Amino acid sequence: MESRMEGDVYSGFGERYQMDGKLLQNFQKSFVQVQDILDQNRLLINEINQNHESKQADHLGRNVGLIRELNNNIRTVASLYGDLSHSFARSVDASSEGESTGTLKSDGKANNQKRFRSG
């Protein structure tokens, strides 16, 4: 019975937040970019640590450039995650605009639908 309930939850989620293939492709592309940069950062950090442990002047001098590259990569990852978050929020907002009466959109404004009282 739990499987059925889980399936109901997932199918409901899928219906509510359907994303088109292009949006999913963009998410996938961004996540691949992020992972590539994080892998590169791991290599940079390893090299920085080795240079630091060697205590050789030329290796320590090289660390300045490596740390700059690492910082730039971190900024790029933060930007990519920000773009992903923005895209996801837009897609959720777009899919929820036609939902039930009296709800609030993510911007805090009420939907324009009106309620009528009987009587």
Swiss-Prot record:
Regulation: induction: Follows a light-dependent circadian-regulated expression with a peak at midday, about 6 hours after dawn.
A single GO molecular-function term is: protein homodimerization activity
Task: List GO terms (cellular component aspect).
Answer: nucleus
Compartment list: Nucleus
InterPro entries the UniProt entry points to: EARLY_FLOWERING_4 (IPR040462), EARLY_FLOWERING_4_dom (IPR009741)
Q: Does the keyword Nucleus apply?
A: yes
An example Pfam family from this entry, by short name, is Elf4
Q: Which domain of life is it from?
A: Eukaryota
What's in the keyword line of the UniProt record? Biological rhythms, Nucleus
Q: Where is this region: Disordered?
A: 91-119
GO BP terms: namely: photoperiodism; positive regulation of circadian rhythm; rhythmic process
Compositional bias (Polar residues): 93-111
**Keyword set includes Lipoprotein:** no
Description of how the protein assembles with itself and partners: Homodimer.
Q: What does this protein do?
A: Component of the central CCA1/LHY-TOC1 feedback loop in the circadian clock that promotes clock accuracy and is required for sustained rhythms in the absence of daily light/dark cycles.
Which family is this protein grouped under?
Belongs to the EARLY FLOWERING 4 family.
The identity of this protein, by name, is: Protein ELF4-LIKE 2
Annotated organism of origin? Arabidopsis thaliana
- Organism lineage string: Eukaryota, Viridiplantae, Streptophyta, Embryophyta, Tracheophyta
